[in-house]
Design a protein with these regions (language model features):
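Helix-rich catalytic cores of soluble enzyme domains
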Residues: 1-174
């Protein structure tokens, strides 16, 4: 997994791959991937944009993934959040293609919701599952590979809540 914490570190990752595989091979073949997180709502910071440009120029894959907490950073409805996820992913994909047409890109999504009483994030909820499934359907229709998050929970103990949330969030990720 390539570094995305600063564009120069992304370039270091590409350069290390060039040492391992050969520079020409790396330019012709995808040998690594990176995870570009979008700061929802609809914010691409300079660090992520710079790293995305480095990987696109080098023909290396980038997972373009919004980090969305429904009800806090996105609409509370499934349809509203799904719309935002797709808009953010397509913005990242488009930028990557402007940098290098044909650059490999993977659509991603990290979606959860918020407890409107406490403000705490919730995991393994039906809403997050619907958004994750919906995103997968939409990006597959667009011909993009898809990656989603899973196997996380908000429980403080290894208890029934942890098991339920982990299982449900893992299931939607599969």
């Amino acid at each position: 997994m390539g570094s995305v914490t600063e564009p120069s570190r992304a370039q270091d990752s590409v350069d290390m791959s060039g040492i391992l595989f050969g520079k020409d091979f790396v330019q012709q073949n995808t040998v690594m991937t990176s995870l570009i997180n979008i700061n929802s709502p609809m914010t691409f910071d300079g660090i992520m944009m710079g790293a995305l440009a480095v990987y696109a120029q080098a023909n290396q894959a980038a997972i373009v993934s919004p980090f969305i907490v429904g009800g806090a950073m996105a609409p509370v409805t499934v349809a509203g959040t799904l719309t935002q996820v797709l808009a953010e992913v397509l913005a990242g994909v488009s930028y990557s293609q402007l940098v290098r047409p044909g650059a490999p890109v993977i659509a991603g999504a990290f979606v959860t919701s918020i407890d409107m009483n406490s403000g705490a994030p919730t995991f393994g909820t039906p809403e997050a599952a619907h958004i994750t499934y919906g995103t997968g359907q939409l990006v597959r229709r667009l011909g993009l590979p898809y990656r989603s998050a899973g196997a996380f929970c908000g429980s403080k103990l290894p208890d029934a809540q942890a098991a339920y949330e982990s299982a449900n969030s893992l299931n939607m990720g599969l």
